[in-house]
A protein has these predicted regions:
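Short beta->alpha transition motifs characteristic of CBS
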Residues: 124, 144-147
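Core segments of cupin and vicinal oxygen chelate
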Residues: 30-71
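N-terminal beta-strand motif that seeds the catalytic metal site of vicinal oxygen chelate
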Residues: 17-36, 88-92
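Vicinal oxygen chelate
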Residues: 33-36, 90-137
């Protein structure tokens, strides 16, 4: 009987914690060797808005925000960074996939499908299109047309 009473008391607490304390994505921090080159890429190619850095500038940083409020924080480093496999990537959706592809082509940015075939678009089983490319530091980015 004591176990039943305990469960009846604790279930509302667990439910409250799940509903009112859920995680919300805030930002992705990336180490970069060339802060200007990487920052310009996220600003000019991906269209992220540069925002004020709300932290110390040691080490130097640049922060960016997407239209939906997702933030990318670039942090300068002198250490040599290891290459990252394509399976570890950030993914973004765009309304006009073809316009985005033309923007990449106009800026001489190579993209491809999951296998790595250059300038090839991946058509997923669910009908959505996706491409993969790398930022100047070598981080993998997926762009798709998921609504």
């Amino acid at each position: 009987m004591k176990k039943i009473i305990f469960l009846l008391l604790i279930i509302p607490i667990i439910k409250y914690g799940q509903n009112n304390n859920s995680l919300k994505f805030n930002h992705q921090a990336l180490l970069v060797n060339d802060l200007n080159q990487s920052g310009d890429f996220y600003n000019n190619i991906l269209g992220f808005e540069e925002i004020e850095v709300g932290a110390s500038q040691k080490p130097p940083k640049r922060w960016f925000k997407s239209d939906d409020g997702m933030e990318i924080h670039l942090i300068s480093t002198k250490e040599k960074l290891k290459s990252i496999p394509k399976g570890v990537h950030m993914a973004f959706s765009v309304k006009n996939f073809d316009l985005f592809i033309n923007n990449l082509k106009g800026n001489n940015i190579t993209y491809g499908n999951w296998r790595g075939d250059e300038n090839q678009i991946q058509l997923r089983n669910d009908g959505y299109k996706q491409i993969f490319f790398q930022d100047p530091q070598g981080y993998w980015i997926e762009v798709n047309n998921i609504k």
